[in-house]
Amino acid sequence: KVNAPELLRREIPKKKKRGAVWVSGVCDPYQPLEAKYRLTRQCLEILAQNNWPAIIQTRSPLVLRDIDIIRDARDFEAGLSVTTADDEIRKLFEPHAPPIEQRIQALDELHRAGIRTYAMVAPMLPGAEGLAELLRGKIDSIIIDRMNYHYADWVYRKYGLEDSLADDFFYRTRQALASL
């Protein structure tokens, strides 16, 4: 992947139809090594220089390092995955991800910089109902999805969280978050 900026620079002129580039819906673009290699930053610079729309999704407050590019680009938006308001729950399901408070703070800083922001509450974890108050005024939109990974059901059972797998939990929490 170290040649990603070079490939992007070469491929963009070949594209006749513009579509938003999702950076990155599958693999976090701000993993710890990004601090050293700066590949995401280079790719964002290339996209911005070519007026190419981009949607950035991460769990990492490292996205703030690139706030200048994101803010000044013509059509960029940035979002953070925030699956619960409860950091103890985060530790069970996302033990290596940044704390919830840091992600909320990053959303706030991005939003105050005039950047379109969103929260990705997917998968919705126990404690997500507390996100409404934490996210209010910090996002322009929200994406919500339930826990669809049945291989994770054992974690719910082990810690007595089965109620959060129920349809009622999803619909009740979705309604609370929809008010944003």
Q: Model-flagged regions — what are they?
A:
Residues 7-8, 39-43, 66, 102-106, ...:
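A general structural detector for well-ordered alpha-helical segments in enzyme core domains, enriched
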Residues 1-77, 84-88, 100, 112:
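Conserved Radical SAM active-site core
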Residues 96, 106-129:
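Conserved strand-turn element in the central/C-terminal portion of the radical SAM core barrel
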